[in-house]
Amino acid sequence: MRIEEDLKLGFKDVLFRPKRSTLKSRSQVSLTRQFTFKHTQTQWQGVPVIAANMDTVGSFAMARTLASFEMMTAVHKHYSLAQWQTFVSETDPALLGHVMVSTGTSEDDFTKTRQILAMSSALRFICVDVANGYSQHFVEFLRKIREACPNHVILAGNVVTGEMVEELILSGADIVKVGIGPGSVCTTRVKTGVGYPQLSAIIECADAAHGLGGQIVGDGGCTCPGDVAKAFGGGADFVMLGGMLAAHEECGGEIVDVDGEPFMKFYGMSSSSAMDKHAGGVAEYRASEGKTVLLPYRGPVENTVRDILGGVRSTCTYVGASQLKELTKRTTFIRVREQENNVYGKE
């Protein structure tokens, strides 16, 4: 047993230190990034925010809307092949360039993913997603799918430490998904005692990935546009959002009437709700590691997207970054004990 004495930080522990800027308006800030991926040398250009591969967030409808903002969607793995075929046949190939095909690590997942990718050459992204990216089985699956799909960009996770980021990149991942336990409907830290404060995880994992020519996704922990900006400021190349995009028209979640007001069900993918729906219940050898909540129905997601992107643009103007790429170079975080004045409630 050993104890690491270094203090690790989450988004609530810091604020940006403002800096002099020559920018006159938020409209001068570009949030578009261009990446060349390590294993394929293919390029992608867009706004590096990704809708999470949760079945109440990462839907086909969400993908269509976010693509209009040049954002990405990791479409959840529970759509059938027939549903994928319909989506692909009805969708502009340019839009498919903003879609990730999500998969688990079973043999059935592997076979299904290859069948989906064969539907269109425009499907270039694979999201290999497990809760625990530290298992040898996961690394072996990553090598297998890299060998089978040499021309596809692979996102793999989740991990929270630099050495495992390096392992995944060297095993075939172009992008590594970072985050264990920070999500709004994740209870892993409570059920297992395992986790890592998200901002420190991003800072440390970004350093490891960039040294090998890879990228990272900060996955989880963002509750407001300022948190998204902090993730980018900490070095994340992409930021993945679940709860911030939940309960919208495009989500496909179950709508529940509560005292005449519409609410939408939102749950973690390791929750009993998810396992009841997709796995026939919680297996006797495991515990649920997610919660189920009802969120007020929020209408079309485009208004929320504009709020998030507007907040990040504003961050850039405060620190003098004319492009999102410059934000991490212009970032100085200050440690704080308070974030906002809540005398009249939270934003």
UniProtKB/Swiss-Prot annotation:
Q: Where is the active site?
A: C186 (thioimidate intermediate)
Report the EC number(s), separated by commas if there are several: 1.7.1.7
Enumerate the GO terms in the molecular function aspect: GMP reductase activity; metal ion binding
Q: Which domain of life is it from?
A: Bacteria
* Keywords for the protein's UniProt record, in alphabetical order: Metal-binding, NADP, Oxidoreductase, Potassium
Q: One GO cellular component from the entry?
A: GMP reductase complex
Q: Which residues bind NADP(+)?
A: 108-131, 216-239
Q: Where does K(+) bind?
A: G181, G183
Task: Report the record's Gene Ontology biological process terms.
Answer: purine nucleotide metabolic process
**Listed CDD domains:** IMPDH
Q: Which reaction does it catalyse?
A: IMP + NH4(+) + NADP(+) = GMP + NADPH + 2 H(+)
The UniProt similarity line reads:
Belongs to the IMPDH/GMPR family. GuaC type 1 subfamily.
**Known partners and oligomeric status:** Homotetramer.
For this protein, the record's HAMAP family field holds:
GMP_reduct_type1
Main role?
Catalyzes the irreversible NADPH-dependent deamination of GMP to IMP. It functions in the conversion of nucleobase, nucleoside and nucleotide derivatives of G to A nucleotides, and in maintaining the intracellular balance of A and G nucleotides.
Any idea what this protein is called? GMP reductase
Gene for this chain: guaC
